[in-house]
Every structure is written in C-alpha cells, then in structure tokens.
From Swiss-Prot:
Keyword Ion transport: no
Prosequence residues removed at maturation: 1-10, 21-33
NCBIfam families according to UniProt: amanitin (TIGR04309)
Disulfide bond sites: none
Designated name of the protein: MSDIN-like toxin proprotein 6
Top-rank taxon, per record: Eukaryota
GO-annotated molecular function: toxin activity
Native species: Amanita phalloides (Death cap)
Family annotation (InterPro entries): Amanitin/phalloidin (IPR027582)
Keywords, alphabetical: Toxin
Cell division keyword on record: no
Record cross-link Cyclopeptide (Leu-Pro), residues: 11-20
Function of the protein: Probable toxin that belongs to the MSDIN-like toxin family responsible for a large number of food poisoning cases and deaths.
Post-translational modification: Processed by the macrocyclase-peptidase enzyme POPB to yield a toxic cyclic decapeptide. POPB first removes 10 residues from the N-terminus. Conformational trapping of the remaining peptide forces the enzyme to release this intermediate rather than proceed to macrocyclization. The enzyme rebinds the remaining peptide in a different conformation and catalyzes macrocyclization of the N-terminal 10 residues.
C-alpha cells in the first residue's frame, strides 16, 4: 500500500496544482482579452 500511496501522491498533487493553474490561466487570458 505504501508503494500505491507513493505513486498516487505526486499524481494527486500535480492534478490539484494543475487544475487550479489551468483555471487561473484561462481567467487571466480572458481578462486580458
């Protein structure tokens, strides 16, 4: 289970950081446009 958690943690972190980042980028792009 440790291996599974170790593999999921980075994916979850990347997903958590990536999703808000995409939304922020879209918002900034729309604001600039």
């Amino acid at each position: 289970m440790s291996d599974i958690n170790a593999t999921r943690l980075p994916l979850i972190l990347l997903a958590a950081l990536g999703i808000p980042s995409d939304d922020a980028d879209s918002t900034l792009t729309r604001g600039e446009r």
